[in-house]
Regions:
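Conserved beta-loop-beta connector loops within the AMP-binding
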Residues: 18-37, 75-79, 142-149, 180, ...
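Conserved C-terminal "lid"/linker of ANL adenylate-forming enzymes
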Residues: 119-124, 132-134, 153-209
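AMP-binding/adenylate-forming catalytic core of the ANL superfamily
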Residues: 40, 45-46, 56, 65, ...
Length: 209
C-alpha cells in the first residue's frame, strides 16, 4: 500500500513524525488526533535572535529527542500514513470542556452543494468560546440563502456534537485577506454583528455577540 486518500503519505527516510497532546505532551496512539511534531537532521537550529520563539518551537521528550512543533493537527494511522487535518490555531475549548476543531465544522458545511467557501472561527461570548460560521454561497443561490443556512444548521445538528454546532451564521461576499494574501482570521473573529441562527419553521433570528 503506497497511498491513501486524504493522507500526505509517509515521512521520508531520516525523518520521524509523531503526534502529541499539545497540553500534556503525551504521545498519541494510532488514529488519535494531536499536534504533529517532527524530528529531522534537516530541521532548523533556532529562530534568529529570538530565544523565546525557539523555546516555544522545540519540545524535548524523556528520551532526549528534540521535536519541532509544526502547529498542525493530524494523526497517524496503523499503517503509518500521516493525515493533516488543519492548524492547531483552528481549535478551541467549549464551555463543557470539549475540544472543538473548526475544520470539522467546516467539513460539515462544505457538504452542502450551495457553498462556495466558508470560514468557521471560535469567538469569546459570555466567558467561553463558541463557533460561528462565515459563509459564501455559490452564484445563483442568493435568492434562497435563508434556506441554505437552515439546511446547513440542521445537518450540523445531526452530524456534530452540540458544542460544535455554529451559534450563528453570516453570509459574506468575500473574506478579508492580509498583505501576504492569506486570509485574515483575526479580522474575521472581530466581526460579531448581524449573524443569524435558525429557530424553526423557516425563521432566522438575527443575533450579535
Amino acid at each position: 500500500l503506497h497511498s491513501k486518500v486524504g493522507s500526505v503519505g509517509f515521512p521520508i527516510r531520516g525523518v520521524t513524525v509523531s503526534v502529541f497532546d499539545s497540553v500534556t505532551n503525551k504521545e498519541m496512539k494510532y488514529g488519535e488526533r494531536g499536534e504533529i511534531r517532527v524530528d529531522s537532521p534537516a530541521r532548523m537550529k533556532e529562530y534568529y535572535k529570538n530565544l523565546q520563539a525557539t523555546k516555544d518551537f522545540f519540545y524535548t521528550d524523556e528520551n532526549g529527542v528534540m521535536w519541532g512543533r509544526t502547529g498542525d493537527i493530524g494523526y497517524v494511522d496503523e499503517d503509518g500514513f500521516l493525515f493533516v487535518l488543519g492548524r492547531a490555531s483552528d481549535t478551541f475549548t467549549s464551555k463543557s470542556g470539549e475540544k472543538i476543531y473548526c475544520f470539522d465544522i467546516e467539513a460539515a458545511i462544505w457538504e452542502n452543494e450551495n457553498i462556495a467557501d466558508c470560514e468557521v472561527v471560535g469567538i469569546s461570548a459570555n466567558g467561553y468560546e463558541i463557533p460561528v460560521a462565515h459563509i459564501i454561497v455559490k452564484e445563483g443561490c442568493e435568492s434562497y440563502e435563508d434556506k441554505v443556512i437552515e439546511t446547513i444548521h440542521m445537518y450540523c445538528q445531526q452530524k456534530l456534537t452540540e458544542d460544535a454546532v455554529p451559534c450563528g451564521y453570516k453570509i459574506c461576499k468575500s473574506f478579508p485577506v492580509k498583505d501576504s494574501g492569506k486570509r485574515d482570521i483575526e479580522l474575521i473573529k472581530q466581526d460579531r454583528t448581524n449573524f443569524v441562527v435558525p429557530i424553526g419553521n423557516g425563521i432566522l433570528k438575527e443575533i450579535s455577540f
